[in-house]
């Protein structure tokens, strides 16, 4: 390209150009021709145009061609221009200026400079923006001249600028706009990522989405690790193939790198070992197993060649030697630990065998008793009452006996599984009851059901509805008590007395025959009759003397029924007024008199923890009544038991075989049924505390 004059001469004929300038109206916007602004610069004058992408930053002004052409606007455009008004900016070609002068074009000097500057800006904008060029040409020339200008542009091939740093030519078309899409040559090419992982053959990557070739799985996270996770979860055989291929590649790379010593160096630092070592060893084991089974794997050839070239056989021998040494050290350590554990156990057993206690009288007595028990022969085993014996003894119906015998362990008679109960059902009352669903218990003789599965409640049911079965249960209880060593009956007197009072029995009333609608009158026991008769006789006389030993006042006898309610007192005294008082014999009439006589003895009273000076009486409820207080004794049960233990300890100190005497145990049980004879250790401790 030449200067601006040559450009005008090449684009327009001289006559047309002069006529267009002379015939232009006052409304032509000259500012639309000038594109000089603070944001505009020559395409080759700054470093902003060194890259091809910088040419897309220019945008056409939205207000071009809108302002009117006037001298004020021309002057304003001259003043606002950032170019120097000196003649240095003018073209040095004087030939074209002479041509203009020869053709008689008379213009002002300032207007001439404006025209030259316009042509220079036109040349620059022609290379930068096609849209601005079209706007300027459409505003400056008529349609005829615009067509001619386009024809001249087609014939002239402009010289393309060259980007100096890159050496790439600028875009060939000067008509590219900012809105148009950039060309392929102008955008830098993105380096394609290498996909060397063997997982990629199982996936297709389309538009940044990886799709599995075997199922409908797709993901935008196009990474080999995620794809391997999919194969591991849904295509296990392919996943194993990928892992084996990865291991082969890693092993080959590791061996070719010359770092084979790190592969089998057990003592080396783990951080320096490659992360795929464990996986490689697993692959080697798999390949070895395949070779033993007669299967040939294509990776075996690679391994054999690598081992032959790099001499891994020696490394394997070293590894085996190190492993054997490590195993020997581990076995030796395990043997030492076992020996230490055995020694500790022996020491603990020896310490547990030696009793650690002080040498005092209580401990010596306990040791003596322990030695005697070991020297005495063991008593013969007492036969236990089994369920079969009870069932055979009692007369059950055939169907009930069959259900009881056929019921498996953990189920009821109906075969329903039952949860394991904590309580042992050794009481004979359970022969008449069976387990039902929902932890219920049912009677085998009727439709009675209850959730309170306790032997006492079940006995009350038998007592109220099945008298014969209740008597059998009481008989079996007595037999079991004797066989288990619980000598003597229970509190039979109190039980019979309570049953008699609640039943409303009368001493003089004979028992009536049973009827279907009314229950029978309970039979009066002989012991209860004697107690009632003696109580009536004492109430008639103010003082009753028995063998001159114990004096019981009338006031004390009046309080014997203080523990009973009014209804129970009336029930107990029914028919007593017509009873004749029997003459007392030399022998005691009942057990209570015998007990009171025994209490008079000083040694026995001290044994029972009671004083001899204070008279003692017992009411119908079994409560001890003192004559002075006329109320039940308020002594603490624990204190009484301690006093009894001390007295028994003194007797045991005089005769050490006292506790093993069966008659002495029966005697103590008769005196105090509620008192339990303590062990030898407790008696020895009580004896030491006394002294």
Swiss-Prot record:
Any single GO CC term annotated in Swiss-Prot or TrEMBL for this entry: NELF complex
> Which N-terminal stretch is annotated as signal sequence?
none
> Which GO molecular function entries does the Swiss-Prot or TrEMBL record give?
DNA binding; zinc ion binding
In which residue ranges is the amino acid composition biased (Polar residues)? Answer: 58-79
Span of zinc fingers (BED-type):
194-242, 424-473
Q: What PROSITE patterns does the record tag this protein with?
A: ZF_BED
Tell me yes or no: is Lipoprotein among this UniProt entry's keywords: no
Q: Report TM segments.
A: none
Write out the biased-composition intervals (Low complexity): 31-46, 171-183
Matching InterPro entries, A to Z?
A: Znf_BED, Znf_C2H2_sf
Q: Which residues bind Zn(2+) 1?
A: 212, 215, 230, 235
- Top-rank taxon, per record: Eukaryota
Q: Where does Zn(2+) 2 bind?
A: 443, 446, 461, 466
- Keywords for this protein: Metal-binding, Repeat, Zinc, Zinc-finger
Any idea what a deletion of this gene does?
No visible phenotype.
Q: Which GO terms describe its biological process?
A: negative regulation of transcription elongation by RNA polymerase II
**Compositional bias annotation for Basic and acidic residues:** 47-57
Where is the region Disordered?
18-97, 171-195
Q: Which proteins does it associate with, and in what oligomeric form? A: Interacts with gex-3.
Q: What is this protein called?
A: Gex-3-interacting protein 13
